[in-house]
């Protein structure tokens, strides 16, 4: 039997960002591929002391794992929501019983949060243990892209166990295609708009115009060329988006993607790229991002070094050039809405 680990969310505070959307879509796609849920239920361990929480999560995971038999396959979304210091040992135990264990990576925290000065040392140690020990023993790992694969190889994970996803899928109930797109429409920015992640929004050049969707935006600091539309639930957001391109950019500078979040784009596939493409919009990405390779290969967007170059780059596109980008974005978007990329990656797991 093929299973996926179904970890229950304890809180719903992230309902209006894409954090839950990516995991929920993975679960829906693998269900369609015949995977069964393996339920991991936990009490609110946030209210427990560290040791008690670790023991509680380990006991719950062991109980879930006890249902698996030789020949079964288990897919785990990474990082785990209810990871404990005992997880690696428990995974090894079921592997010795003949269970194959695979991971699909959403984030590598060692490349992101663990580099922040504000992250406690115990959290950095946990990240190191989880990412170094747990992924190393996997029977297969789905990474975002070839660049992330190379980082994992440097961490000691055998290359033959690694599969590249290429881009995240994004399911849209009741999808409606958008018509009449033009290169002169505003640039779309969706997602977490808070200062620490999207500080560049307060430093944009006067043109082009930008349409903003998400949480954390300081409207009192909005620029003249910015229009803020508020936040939406992930499944409602695609219908609300209006513009000519979707922007994938992070950090505190419009000159380049900078800081912890900006540098992270060198390695990861931002989920908002999938949102834009699934919604039918071509992308604007940072030229040094991992995603730029996919975008340029598929012809579904443009890549720039700086947002100060964006207006000129768009102006230099002919209407026919832009329509080609739109057509390619819609073609890739159809694949993304169908779950094509995860389905393909699952077939390549050893």
Regions found by a protein language model. Name each.
Residues 1-43, 202-208:
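N-terminal subdomain of nucleotide-sugar transferases
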Residues 90-100, 120-141:
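Membrane-proximal helix-turn-helix segments that form the acceptor-binding/catalytic region
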Residues 23, 170-242:
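Conserved catalytic-core segment of nucleotide-activated headgroup transferases in glycan assembly
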Residues 179-180, 305-312, 318-350:
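A charged, aromatic-enriched C-terminal amphipathic alpha-helix characteristic of glycosyltransferases
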Residues 53, 64-86, 99-102:
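Short N-terminal targeting/anchoring amphipathic segment
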């Amino acid at each position: 039997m093929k299973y996926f680990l179904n970890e229950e969310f304890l809180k719903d505070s992230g309902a209006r960002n894409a954090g839950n959307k990516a995991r929920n879509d993975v679960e829906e796609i693998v269900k369609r591929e015949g995977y069964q849920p393996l339920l991991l239920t936990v009490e609110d361990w946030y209210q427990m002391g560290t040791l008690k929480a670790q023991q509680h999560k380990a006991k719950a995971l062991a109980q879930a794992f006890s249902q698996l038999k030789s020949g079964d396959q288990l897919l785990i979304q990474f990082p785990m929501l209810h990871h404990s210091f005992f997880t690696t040992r428990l995974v090894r135990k079921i592997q010795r019983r003949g269970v194959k264990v695979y991971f699909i990576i959403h984030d590598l925290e060692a490349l992101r949060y663990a580099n922040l000065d504000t992250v406690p040392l115990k959290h950095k140690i946990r990240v190191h243990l989880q990412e170094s020990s747990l992924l190393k023993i996997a029977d297969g790992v789905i990474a975002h892209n070839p660049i992330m694969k190379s980082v994992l190889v440097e961490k000691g994970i055998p290359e033959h166990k690694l599969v590249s996803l290429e881009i995240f899928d994004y399911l849209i109930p009741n999808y409606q295609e958008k018509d009449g797109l033009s290169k002169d429409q505003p640039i779309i920015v969706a997602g977490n708009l808070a200062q620490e992640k999207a500080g560049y929004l307060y430093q944009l050049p006067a043109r082009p115009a930008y349409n903003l969707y998400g949480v954390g935006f300081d409207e009192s600091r909005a620029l003249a060329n910015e229009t803020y539309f508020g936040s939406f639930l992930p499944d409602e957001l695609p219908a609300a988006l209006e513009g000519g391109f979707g922007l994938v950019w992070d950090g505190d500078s419009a000159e380049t993607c900078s800081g912890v979040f900006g540098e992270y784009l060198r390695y990861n596939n931002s989920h908002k790229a999938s949102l834009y493409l699934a919604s039918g919009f071509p992308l604007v990405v940072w030229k040094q991002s991992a995603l730029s390779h996919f975008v340029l290969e598929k012809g579904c967007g443009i890549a720039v070094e700086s947002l100060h170059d964006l207006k000129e780059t768009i102006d230099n596109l002919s209407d026919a050039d832009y329509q080609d980008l739109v057509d390619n974005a819609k073609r890739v978007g159809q694949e993304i809405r169908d779950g094509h990329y995860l389905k393909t990656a699952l077939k390549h797991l050893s």
